[in-house]
Amino acid sequence: MIRRKKDKFSLLLTEIAKNIDETAEYFVNFKVTNQTTLKEFADTLKEYETKGDNHVHVMIKELNKAFITPIEREDILQLTNSLDDVLDGIEHFSAMMEIFSITSSDEHIDKFSGYIRECAKEILITIELLAENRLKDIQPHAIKIKEYEHSCDNLHRKSLKNLFGNETDPIKVIQYREIYETLEEIADSCQSVANNLETIIMKNA
């Protein structure tokens, strides 16, 4: 971050970002076809989320022990929490799919997933740049994250319009509305990561 040598906070943030990247990769590529694969999908994403929670616990412990941090303690914590929100959102999506017994995707879910996958790639790049103290190089990637989030906003409106205009089963309307909103919230969490990174740039560049 501010120092040339990677400190323990940079290393922990990188581990968190790598876990998000791996989670998003699995999230996009795993194909749910029946109840068995749906359970496997939800269970695996829960494992990724638990791994992320463990990273957060270590980060908080290290922050509490540290006398000096490379950037403001509160900024590290906010960034950590926003990263964790991305993982929590993905796990929540899989839990909703399992609760609703939805064993197939649709074009809107696929598009949301693609944007979230791209956000995860950009998040990993930004955290690695932060760890290398290349603050000025972060901005273009933060902008990309915000662009993907904006695309998800538009997709959210489009998906709801299609849902309310074409679905006649009221139960499915309720279920898919919650699914789409959960996906849009994941994108919002990605944008929060970008916002926190921009705050760090502003304070330290």
From Swiss-Prot:
Q: Which Gene3D superfamilies match?
A: Phosphate transport system protein phou homolog 2, domain 2
Q: Write down the InterPro entries for this protein, in alphabetical order.
A: PhoU-like_sf (IPR038078), Put_Phosphate_transp_reg (IPR018445), UPF0111_domain (IPR052912)
Q: What is the consequence of disrupting this locus?
A: Non-essential, it can be disrupted.
Q: According to its UniProt record, which protein family does this protein belong to?
A: Belongs to the UPF0111 family.
Name of the protein this chain belongs to: UPF0111 protein YkaA
Lineage, opening ranks: Bacteria, Bacillati, Bacillota, Bacilli, Bacillales
